[in-house]
């Protein structure tokens, strides 16, 4: 009984981040609001996300003195706030750890802001890997 109570307390006090490893065919359904935004088609997003995070929402990469978070690899230098970079501009007005769960709503809102301000080439993988020959990034099931 004591272990059950302990487990219950731990689960209440420390909710688990629900991470998700998406597939190429799951992402278009979740990212449908991104299709065409800023002139970027879904296959370009799917390709870019694959090459930046491997479709894994819990991807964290230390990069050039900053840290990039989640599916879209959003940087703590400018876009989100974390304990490592208290000087972040936090343009998306969000905690970086929000980009590590399976709810992509806030990720997409921030990615759209990045796209508006920086363009698709903010994501370095896009130009060399995802700007042409996108057939392989379409899901045959759709």
Curated annotation (Swiss-Prot):
Keywords: Calcium, Disulfide bond, Lactose biosynthesis, Metal-binding, Milk protein, Secreted, Signal. Ca(2+) binds at residues 98, 101, 103, 106-107. SUPFAM superfamilies: Lysozyme-like. Pfam families: Lys (PF00062). Disulfide bonds join 25-139, 47-130, 80-96, 92-110. It is found in: Secreted. GO terms for molecular function: calcium ion binding; lactose synthase activity; lysozyme activity. GO terms for cellular component: extracellular region. Residues 1-19 form the signal peptide. Gene3D superfamilies: 1.10.530.10. One of its GO terms (biological process) is lactose biosynthetic process. Mammary gland specific. Secreted in milk. InterPro entries: Glyco_hydro_22 (IPR001916), Glyco_hydro_22_CS (IPR019799), Lactalbumin (IPR000545), Lysozyme-like_dom_sf (IPR023346). Residues 20-142 form the C-type lysozyme domain. Lactose synthase (LS) is a heterodimer of a catalytic component, beta1,4-galactosyltransferase (beta4Gal-T1) and a regulatory component, alpha-lactalbumin (LA). Belongs to the glycosyl hydrolase 22 family. PANTHER family: ALPHA-LACTALBUMIN (PTHR11407:SF32), LYSOZYME C (PTHR11407). Regulatory subunit of lactose synthase, changes the substrate specificity of galactosyltransferase in the mammary gland making glucose a good acceptor substrate for this enzyme. This enables LS to synthesize lactose, the major carbohydrate component of milk. In other tissues, galactosyltransferase transfers galactose onto the N-acetylglucosamine of the oligosaccharide chains in glycoproteins. This is Alpha-lactalbumin. The gene is LALBA.
């Amino acid at each position: 009984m004591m272990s059950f109570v302990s487990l219950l307390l731990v689960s209440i006090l420390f909710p688990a981040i629900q991470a998700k490893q998406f597939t190429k065919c799951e992402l278009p359904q979740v990212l449908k609001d991104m299709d065409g935004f800023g002139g970027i088609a879904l296959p370009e997003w799917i390709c870019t996300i694959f090459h930046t995070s491997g479709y894994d929402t819990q991807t964290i990469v230390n990069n050039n003195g900053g840290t990039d978070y989640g599916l879209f690899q959003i940087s703590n230098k400018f876009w989100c706030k974390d304990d490592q970079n208290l000087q972040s501009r936090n343009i998306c007005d969000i905690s970086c750890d929000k980009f590590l769960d399976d709810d992509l709503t806030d990720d997409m809102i921030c990615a759209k802001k990045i796209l508006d301000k920086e363009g698709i080439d903010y994501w370095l993988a896009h130009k060399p890997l995802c700007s042409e020959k996108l057939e392989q990034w379409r899901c045959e099931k759709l």
